[in-house]
Every structure is written in C-alpha cells, then in structure tokens.
Amino acid sequence: MVGSLIYQSIVEGARVPHEVDRLKKAHNTDAGYDLQVFLPDHLTVKIGPGEKKMVGTGVRVQIPEGYVGLLFGRSSLATKTPFQLANCVGVIDCGYTGEVKLVVRNTSNKEDMWLSADDRIAQLVVVPIFSGGATRVSELASSEHERGEGGFGSTGYTVLKNQVDLVV
C-alpha cells in the first residue's frame, strides 16, 4: 500500500511559481491526478491539422516499485477539443524519473489548434502491476467461463453475429 505519490515540480525559471501544485486530483476519490501543459512564460503552442507535438508537464514523478503510471487523456479532451494523446495511453515505469511529457495530436483536418500553459489535458493513474513471468504452452487449459474466444462485442448483439468481415 502506497501512502502518497512523490513528485517534483520542475518549472524553475518560468513565471509559474515553483510552489504551484502541478499534480493534483480534483477530488480525493478520483482515480487520476490531473496533468497540465507546462509552457514557459505562459506561452501557447500551435498544433496544425493532423500534426502532433510533444509538450511537457513540468512534473517528474517517482512511481513506486510494483506500480505503473498510466497516462490517459482527460474526458474533456475528447468532448471539448480535437486533441488526443497520440499513443492513447502512455506508460511510466517505476524506473523513469524524467519529466512527464505528452504527445498530443490535433485530429482536426482543417483547423490549427492551440494548447495553452496550464491546460489540463491528461491524467496520471497509478496502478499495481503483475510481476510474474510468462510461460509458453502449446494449448490453454479449458476454461470454466462461458466467454471462451468471444470478444469485440460478442455478447448481447446476436442480430449482428456473423455479419462482420474480419481481416486476419
């Protein structure tokens, strides 16, 4: 059990005070810590249509051993902007202690879009990891579960069953 996430604000030399809380949850019960765009002197960065850019957050984190940090776009990113995290989910292993950076893509095919300093665009969720090894077998043991090989919405959609062409 981990008591708190250790982080360092690395925004020295900018107009943002070093004491600004750059990693926080909006509510104590939230799963993720909000991450803000850090741009020196409150500048903006233009991202053209279909373009992607890496932006810093001004934060370094110390992910505890046995855990991983997962970076997700905030839900408002998808509902209010054409931005998305280019890799969909970022992974921060416990050994990485550099600045947390985000690769942001403008999904608009027409408009330039701007990110501003302190825009909250991502969240960091820290979860335990499975630390076991991997064992190769020639066949999986039979499962007591009904699902079997069903996937991709195979439950609850009997009308559409067998109407999807799969490319394998």
Regions found by a protein language model. Give the residues of each.
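DUTPase catalytic domain/fold
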Residues: 1-168
